[in-house]
């Protein structure tokens, strides 16, 4: 999957109220592609829209790690 396709998927999921699992998978893919800005946006969306889920806990952990890495 290309970065453009992943971005399109992420936008589609966000527009459709994508589930936490799908958003997390997309954020992790973006992070692997070194698109950390977009990954952080997706992680923040997960934390805000899906609080209390395991995916939100993972997203919060990744945000802390990315913030610490600068």
Feature-to-residue mapping (PLM):
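Bacterial signal peptide processing site
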Residues: 16-20
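Conserved small-residue packing positions in alpha-helical repeats and bundles
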Residues: 27, 61-64
């Amino acid at each position: 999957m290309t970065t453009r396709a992943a971005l399109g998927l992420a936008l589609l999921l966000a527009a459709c109220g994508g589930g936490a699992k799908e958003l997390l998978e997309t954020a992790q893919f973006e992070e692997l592609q070194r698109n950390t800005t977009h990954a952080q946006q997706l992680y923040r969306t997960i934390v805000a829209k899906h609080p209390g889920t395991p995916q939100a806990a993972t997203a919060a952990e990744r945000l802390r790690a990315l913030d610490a890495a600068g």
